Amino acid sequence: MRRKIIYESSDFHNAVFVGYDSNGIPRHAHKRGTVTSNSYKGNVAGSQPEFSFHWHGKSDKIFLFEAPIDMLSFVSMHKENWQEHSYAASCSVSDRVLFQCLNDNTNIKNVFLCFDNDEAGQTANKRIADKLNIQNEILVPTYKDWNEDLTFSEKGDEPICHQVL
């Protein structure tokens, strides 16, 4: 919150995830409803998808997710040294933020594709993997997405994806 990347909208109290360009200018905002009965999700008009919600670390790894909440859920399950790695949420099944991050961070040598465990997510994982000319691996959540994996792990089920970090 101190970096102004997540905040609460004043109108509907949505969580807003902000993506910045390499000059620190906000270029993308994704809203997600915070009320259980409200599953609202959407990008703010005029958002540039190549700058969607992301975190730049210093390691050679980047993890790409469909949604910011999945990215944060994954980090919650893998807290140790999480700041070292880079993470991005496409806010869709697009690869634009990934290729922007690769362009901005030439030290990245390993891509982990972490889209949802559904047809759209897995099709996107394969499509993007085919485009990459660097080391990549597809990580599939056990349940529908990484947020569900976190929810179930908090209920006592085994956490997912130990080997990655």
Language model features with spans:
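Helix N-cap/beta->alpha junction signal
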Residues: E66-A67, N117
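A short, charged/proline- and glycine-enriched loop
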Residues: H56-I62
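Short amphipathic alpha-helical face segments that pack within enzyme cores
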Residues: I69-S73
